[in-house]
Amino acid sequence: MHKQVEIFTDGSCLGNPGPGGYGAILRYQQHEKTLSEGFFMTTNNRMELLAAIVALEALKFPCKITLTTDSQYVRQGITKWIHSWKKRQWRKADKSPVLNVDLWKRLDKAIERHEIEWHWVKGHAGHDENERCDELAKAAAQSPTKEDTGYLESQQDKT
């Protein structure tokens, strides 16, 4: 039987694009772990995605997961849109390329071995764990330590 894990995630960006960070809480029985990291230049959607990715990648074994996010972009993307994107070689219905494809591919791989139920909560509405993740993400964004190479590469492609 797989371990039952709760994951809560949030991303933050001070400007969009701008310095950003993610925050995640992983809970298994009475154990809780927090994850956060800040990036010099990124977007809010990239941080929302990265929060879920890093949390899932932190799990050593296949788990049964309830993942709660305040990002419809992440929830809809992974539960609905990704199937069509993959069929169209990572293009949207209008033939334009999917944004953040590096992270969508990474998230797609991260979910493979888990059974995940995706939940959405309204951000800044008093959901305790979401508020804590928001605080972690904002603090990380205010003290960035890493480059978001995927974001930087996507910007170079535009020039």
From Swiss-Prot:
Superkingdom, taxonomy of origin: Bacteria
Residues the record lists as binding Mg(2+) 2: 10, 134
One GO process term, biological-process aspect: DNA replication, removal of RNA primer
The RNase H type-1 domain, residue ranges: 1-142
Spans traversing the lipid bilayer: none
UniProt xrefs under InterPro entries: RNase_H, RNaseH-like_sf, RNaseH_domain, RNaseH_sf, RNaseHI
Cofactor binding: number and manner: Binds 1 Mg(2+) ion per subunit. May bind a second metal ion at a regulatory site, or after substrate binding.
Compartmental location: Cytoplasm
Cofactor: Mg(2+)
Main location, first listed in the record: cytoplasm
Molecular-function GO term, any one: magnesium ion binding
Disordered: annotated segments: 135-159
Swiss-Prot/TrEMBL catalytic activity: Endonucleolytic cleavage to 5'-phosphomonoester
Compositional bias of kind Basic and acidic residues: 145-159
Keywords: Cytoplasm, Endonuclease, Hydrolase, Magnesium, Metal-binding, Nuclease
Residues noted as binding Mg(2+) 1 in the record, renumbered to the chain: 10, 48, 70
Pfam families linked to this entry: RNase_H
GO CC term, one of those recorded: cytoplasm
EC number: 3.1.26.4
Family label: Belongs to the RNase H family.
Record text on subunit structure and interactions: Monomer.
Task performed by this protein: Endonuclease that specifically degrades the RNA of RNA-DNA hybrids.
Protein name: Ribonuclease H
Encoding gene, per UniProt annotation: rnhA
